[in-house]
A protein has these predicted regions:
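Conserved ABC ATPase "signature" region
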Residues: 98, 102, 108-124
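Short, charged/small-residue-rich alpha-helical element at the C-terminal edge
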Residues: 216-280
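Conserved ABC transporter NBD signature motif
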Residues: 58-69, 73-74
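ABC ATPase "signature
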Residues: 211-212
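Catalytic Walker B motif of ABC-type/P-loop ATPase nucleotide-binding domains
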Residues: 152-156
């Protein structure tokens, strides 16, 4: 089942075309990566999918229904982390979480559980207005996942985080996905997308330039070559077919082979190849 979809969605801000006939679908239970550099329409797409913006043209569906039909019960199944997500500045981390938990009818024990997973368990008394950008981002994420949403929108969720904290957040997201949460993730971090996402879409100039499973995209755009690294440091290449590989290995009989692998690009290299632009 498609948990959300867009069909030929377009949106302009004045004379600027933000999205131009955008079409894609996300299956329930997957982590879907919406990838591209700043300014290509990733945040705009989330705002459309959460009804913060209305399209000029096209159809949007969430939970299998036109987005205009979503009621409060449907929105209670959604979690959002974005630049527009707010906190109560004069309240502590714990107080912000407690307020949200009370509104959702959640037990206080759930607060401690989530704060532990985002690395804020020892910072519950800190006032929100004094938080660093990274800590604020983790608080907003904690609030977004507190109620175990069916659908989670994450706009650059680890952009301000250090590697250790990023790894912890990735573990949390995998755990939630294993529990049934569908995650729509925007990022310009292709390594993050490769680690987390079942499928990805490359967004460029308001359109989908390419989409697919990361491993399959790497094979699709791989060089038709195989690289053999010998133990003495010498590197050799041959065509990627059984005959050429077999002939090369036969010629190397008696020499120590350290590795044999195809020359597959990473997602960042594929994005550059497909769109002609870098991610930064």
């Amino acid at each position: 089942m498609d948990i959300l979809s867009m069909q030929n969605v377009s949106l302009s801000f004045g004379s600027t075309r933000a999205l131009d006939g955008l079409s894609f679908a996300v299956k329930e239970g997957e982590i879907f990566g919406f990838l591209g550099p700043s300014g290509v329409g990733k945040t705009t797409t989330i705002k459309l999918l959460t009804r913060q913006l209305r399209p000029d043209a096209g159809k949007i569906a969430v939970f299998g229904a036109p987005i205009a039909r979503l009621d409060s019960a449907a929105y209670e199944q959604i979690g959002i982390l974005s630049d527009n997500s707010g906190v109560y500045e004069r309240m502590s981390i714990y107080e912000n979480m407690k307020l949200f938990a009370d509104l959702r009818g959640l037990p206080a024990s759930r607060i401690g559980e989530v704060l532990e997973k985002v690395g804020l368990a020892d910072a519950g008394k800190r006032v929100a207005k004094k938080l660093s950008k990274g800590m604020r981002q983790r608080l907003i994420l904690a609030m977004a996942v507190l109620h175990r949403p069916r659908l989670l929108f994450l706009d650059e969720p680890t952009a301000a985080l250090d590697p250790a904290t990023t790894a912890a957040i990735h573990r949390l997201l995998r755990e939630m996905n294993d529990g049934g949460t569908t995650i729509f993730l925007t990022t310009h971090n292709m390594e993050e997308a490769d680690r987390l996402c079942a499928r990805v879409a490359f967004l460029n100039e308001g359109r989908i330039a390419e989409t697919g499973v990361p491993a399959q995209l790497k094979l699709k755009y791989a060089k038709d070559r195989v690289r053999v690294l010998l133990e003495d440091g010498e590197a050799l290449e041959c065509a990627r077919n059984p005959e050429a590989i077999g002939a090369l290995l036969a010629d190397l009989s008696g020499r120590g082979i350290a590795s044999v692998h195809s020359e597959e690009p990473d997602l960042e290299e594929i994005f550059l190849q497909v769109t002609g632009r870098n991610l930064v």
